[in-house]
Regions:
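Short helix-onset patch at the extreme N-terminus, typifying the N->h transition
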Residues: 6-9, 31, 218
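N-terminal cationic leader/targeting segments used for protein routing and processing
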Residues: 3-6, 137, 160, 165, ...
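Activation on beta-sandwich/Ig-like modules and their edge loops
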Residues: 24-167
Length: 224
């Protein structure tokens, strides 16, 4: 192998590594039910869903959340230590996993669906409009979604697209993005633990393809 080829391969490896790192920590807030604690739901607790759109598992140890107080009252996420690539997990405000699973799935809960908790003063999700802010182990804001009034609603806010640092208003509709009516509470509509296939964000692929293209051009020019 000549020096040129060796250099190109080394550079390509660095570029590919950089591209992969872009996708590794793409955890997004993909569903929110801010009405669940104030309504007549059997489990009586608000909840939200996180989805890993990256290409490797993400360690959630030390991660935390807050509502629209933006970090001043943040509390730890507990009960889940890792979220696999493509996996969606649920966090409820109180420990109500058994009632939650029974309400949504009856006795057919998805195998391996993870449910964690967040508990503390000042982090209840308001029906008049609020936010979910997600912080990584370094205390940095990693993902956030705001939402408007949910008074009178029994459909979750649906962010299956994985949008970040924005507002969500789309409501879950049965048959769309995996949404369904809860087995034991038919007025509730959502898709806890299931969204369209999570894949690395487009910019990751664009970066990888661009890098390979650049190295290919350089190699051809050197060979002339």
């Amino acid at each position: 192998m000549n020096v040129l080829k060796s250099s190109l391969l080394a550079a390509a490896a660095v570029w590919l590594s950089a591209g992969a790192s872009v996708a590794q920590a793409q955890v997004r807030i993909t569903e929110i039910a801010p009405w669940a604690s104030a309504s007549s739901t059997p489990y009586q607790t608000d909840w939200f869903e996180l989805t890993n759109f990256g290409d490797t598992a993400v360690n959630l140890t030390g991660w935390s959340m807050d509502d629209n107080s933006n970090g001043s009252a943040k509390v730890a996420l507990t009960g889940i230590t890792s979220i696999a690539a493509g996996e969606s997990v649920i966090f409820t405000e109180t420990a109500a996993s058994a009632a939650f699973l029974s309400t949504w799935f009856g006795d057919q809960a998805p195998l391996g669906l993870q449910i964690g908790n967040y508990t503390g003063k000042g982090v209840g999700l308001s029906q008049s409009g609020d936010a979910v802010n997600l912080y990584n182990a370094s205390g940095e804001l990693h993902a956030s979604l705001t939402f408007g009034s949910s008074e009178g609603l029994t459909q979750t806010f649906d962010n299956s697209a994985g949008l970040n640092h924005t507002s969500v208003s789309q409501l879950s509709v049965s048959g769309v993005n995996g949404a369904f009516a809860a087995v034991n509470d038919l007025v509730e509509i959502g898709s806890p633990g299931a969204i369209a296939a999570a894949v690395p964000e487009p910019q990751s692929y664009a970066l990888l393809l661009a890098g390979l293209g650049v190295f290919g051009i350089i190699a051809r020019k050197r060979q002339r």
